[in-house]
């Protein structure tokens, strides 16, 4: 297999049915590829007894500067009805179809092919690949690998995360930060009764709706220099009541807040709890955070990445902080990170696909950036 052909590599990697958490063999496959390129590979398994997540740390060279590429092999379930087998990748009319094409197996392969074309590495190259970024066991993925790296004295100088950061065209956006994501579950208790005798009951739906309206009417902030305003979206309202003449005894709701660096998960929980308490005392509110707001301040390496994108695509990449959560929020507390990958338009969708030309172009961007990174690092030393 030609390691400098990103499309062929992507077809192989995408053929692994690596629905999160990835147990498909994709991680050992990547370890084999990188071993052939001279990387020292460590397959790292973390878990809690009920689940085990396989991860990969691979390194070429030693010391600094260390340029790391991060990514994930796990994918969301295919869902729906595909025109092609989601795990039998096909190239048709210049498009590569299959689950993981956009998010983010093709980007991993583009970076590997970029590395395969290097004449020399005047420093250290590394890969951090996890088998669970999409699912519920993320604590055993990138976070656990970073803990392992810290214990072993490994700290990259810069990281490129291959998430699908591009919007309409490859290279139009580079993500330097991510908003935090906080999920809430609200439950209000009432008094069950007959709809004809509301004075003998208390309808918890009224309390839930009042709380949600107050939350939606609350302006959390006006945004910052790098982040848009924080906002809340209601995702569920439920009573589990199939009886038309019954006032239910309880009602639940769920909502999500995407928040910027003016807040923490705990400060937002206190704010939401105060709103609930202003309406009723008969409630419970729980929360689960999928990462706080994070940002890597633009640096000479970020500028270099933008320069390379401009050279290859002709586009002036926008530095953004919107979009969904990613492992960048974990990596950014460890080392500076920028996300640059393929367009996100079909990520997680039926018939997920990317342009073959974009895969080849992304490989060229990665290749030039790797060379330029070491040149910039040497000029600063």
Swiss-Prot record:
Enzyme Commission number(s): 3.5.1.18
Cofactor annotation comment: Binds 2 Zn(2+) or Co(2+) ions per subunit.
GO biological process: diaminopimelate biosynthetic process; L-arginine biosynthetic process; lysine biosynthetic process via diaminopimelate
Positions of Zn(2+) 1 binding: 72, 103, 163
Catalytic machinery residues: 74, 133 (proton acceptor)
InterPro entries linked: ArgE/DapE_CS, Bact_exopeptidase_dim_dom, DapE_proteobac, Peptidase_M20, Peptidase_M20_dimer, Peptidase_M20A
UniProt catalytic activity: N-succinyl-(2S,6S)-2,6-diaminopimelate + H2O = (2S,6S)-2,6-diaminopimelate + succinate
Record key words, sorted: Amino-acid biosynthesis, Cobalt, Diaminopimelate biosynthesis, Hydrolase, Lysine biosynthesis, Metal-binding, Zinc
Cofactor(s) listed: Zn(2+); Co(2+)
Annotated residues for binding of Zn(2+) 2: 103, 134, 348
MF GO annotations: acetylornithine deacetylase activity; cobalt ion binding; succinyl-diaminopimelate desuccinylase activity; zinc ion binding
Keyword field contains Ribosomal protein: no
UniProt pathway: Amino-acid biosynthesis; L-lysine biosynthesis via DAP pathway; LL-2,6-diaminopimelate from (S)-tetrahydrodipicolinate (succinylase route): step 3/3
Family: Belongs to the peptidase M20A family. DapE subfamily.
Subunit: Homodimer.
Function of the molecule: Catalyzes the hydrolysis of N-succinyl-L,L-diaminopimelic acid (SDAP), forming succinate and LL-2,6-diaminopimelate (DAP), an intermediate involved in the bacterial biosynthesis of lysine and meso-diaminopimelic acid, an essential component of bacterial cell walls.
Protein name: Succinyl-diaminopimelate desuccinylase
Protein's organism: Anaplasma marginale (strain Florida)
